[in-house]
Amino acid sequence: MEAYKEKIKEKLSVVPFEPGCYLMKDRNNQVIYVGKAKRLRNRLRSYFTGAHDAKTTRLVGEIRNFEFIVTDSETESLLLELNLIKQYQPRYNILLKDDKSYPFIKITKEKYPRLLVTRTVKKGSGKYFGPYPNAYAAVETKKLLDRIYPFRKCDKMPNKLCLYYHIGQCLGPCVYDVDQKEYDDMTQEVSDFLNGEDKTIIKNLESRMQAASENLEFEQAKEYRDLIQNIHNLTKKQNIMSADNTARDVFGYYISKGWMCIQVFFVRNGNMIQRDTTMIPLQQTPEEEFYTFIGQFYRLNQHLLPKEVHVPKNLDKKMIESVVDTKILQPVRGQKKDLVNMANHNAEVSLQNKFELIARDESRTVKAIEELGEQMGIQTPIRIEAFDNSNIQGVDAVSAMVTFVDGKPDKKGYRKYKIKTVEGPDDYKSMQEVIRRRYTRVLNDGLPLPDLIIVDGGKGQMSVAIDVLENELGLDIPVAGLRKNDKHRTSELLYGPAAEVVPLKKNSQAFYLLQRIQDEVHRFAITFHRKTRQKHSFTSALDEIEGIGPKRKTTLLRTFGSIKKMREATLEDLKEAGLPEKVAESLQKELNKED
């Protein structure tokens, strides 16, 4: 038995039957998964005994150690789990990232508030309204309010009047003493409007329109009429989801084939204005996954707490209340129950659609590799490794390898190589070096061998790869070449001793797969080459400057990223990056000389 398995077995025997959290670690001692359990020993033992689905099998295959923390209750475990996920960001946990955020309108918490569109919710910095279905809806609403209410626009108070004052869209608090009550009343009207109360604002505009008409200011009256119409268009009811205007989020979920789909409806002013769908591979019980999800949803992510949160009846209300600081309801009848049922049903539909799309994708990719193997006369290439070289006149020469498994990219299997033994532009020798390095490592480390190797190029590249594999390493792996046309697009696949063209139809699934492989390996190689060249040119420019050694070069590279940005930096910027004043002055002088 491997040493780590023996160690895990020993640790399992002393885990208590108490609630708590556990942290799974990989060979690098990195936390790759955080979970919680009512009984720690039972849950941890379950990972290392019996059969698992593919997702859990992958996780268990990477575990080399674990830690656990005992808590007094399940509630405490849930809170601790959320904190540990936030701290370690484990890759096997479903992490709700900030890029899945929604637009809000914000009234800032200032003496003279501003009106902003934002995707970031910062507690205590103002009042937020939304979320809006998209940025366009939020921006259009703000534009409308800007035309009606002269809110301050400047981030910092200027010392002179800006354009907005002169066009009547700001009261000019930067220069004039603006009546605080007038500004507060205006803020309250906007707040009421954003909360769904549009009667006050319409009444206000109708009064202005009437006054303008009586004064024969017909252009002004027409503008007020258009604003009233815009408000009606903006606030007209869609499908009424609720009879009242209470802001509420409605949660539902569905489980199938080891996956959980959670659906959230955002209901504002009686309308469903947005929804959120999240797919989760189950590692815990569905209920535990839900508690973790909803905790992340509001605590770790940019979601504004509504007045009410509605959840299915079968969940533990107290567990949810421990991580969500608002009113939790579990409707049992009426319209609110119908909303929860609708969220559950939509979760089911979303999950079934996901499975159907996966099945179609699997069908296409399996068909592609089967067709490829058949046309080449080899066994179906389950694992394909493809290589491409990149350099400019032999300078900063690099190579890259991508891996496709079952016709799909396996990014864990991607590799990058800096060419070490080749002088000048020699594509054949570069390919020879990389093939030798890759498959020597594969043999030494007992890694899986590919069913097919694809090199970018023709007979020459194929020949040097085959020579290394067969004559140096004793490996018999099919090697094919991918040739491009004059437009640099995939043209044909070459295979066999004479590097003959494999008869593939251009519209076949196999040819589409080859195009994807060639594009991906080219992208990966080019990106690596650009980064290598940029780093090399960056460090070369600093070689002649006294006082800048390897460590300072690295620091400058991380701070500025390019010579151009370093040239634009002030003396203070360079000093903040850790350079002594004299060295910073020398650097500025040298860089400006190059200019």
Swiss-Prot record:
Please list the residue ranges annotated as the UVR domain: 199-234
- UniProt xrefs under InterPro entries: GIY-YIG_endonuc, GIY-YIG_endonuc_sf, GIY-YIG_UvrC_Cho, RuvA_2-like, UVR_dom, UVR_dom_sf, UvrABC_protein_C, UvrC
Assembly information from the UniProt record: Interacts with UvrB in an incision complex.
Subcellular localization, as worded in the UniProt entry: Cytoplasm
List keywords of the entry alphabetically: Cytoplasm, DNA damage, DNA excision, DNA repair, Excision nuclease, SOS response
- Annotated function: The UvrABC repair system catalyzes the recognition and processing of DNA lesions. UvrC both incises the 5' and 3' sides of the lesion. The N-terminal half is responsible for the 3' incision and the C-terminal half is responsible for the 5' incision.
List the protein's name.
Answer: UvrABC system protein C
Return the similarity comment: Belongs to the UvrC family.
Which Pfam families does the annotation name? GIY-YIG (PF01541), HHH_5 (PF14520), UVR (PF02151), UvrC_RNaseH (PF22920), UvrC_RNaseH_dom (PF08459)
Annotated gene: uvrC
Residues covered by the GIY-YIG domain = 17-94
Q: Name one GO cellular component term.
A: excinuclease repair complex
A GO molecular function term, named singly, is: excinuclease ABC activity
The record's section on HAMAP family has: UvrC
- Keyword NAD recorded: no
One biological process term in Gene Ontology = nucleotide-excision repair
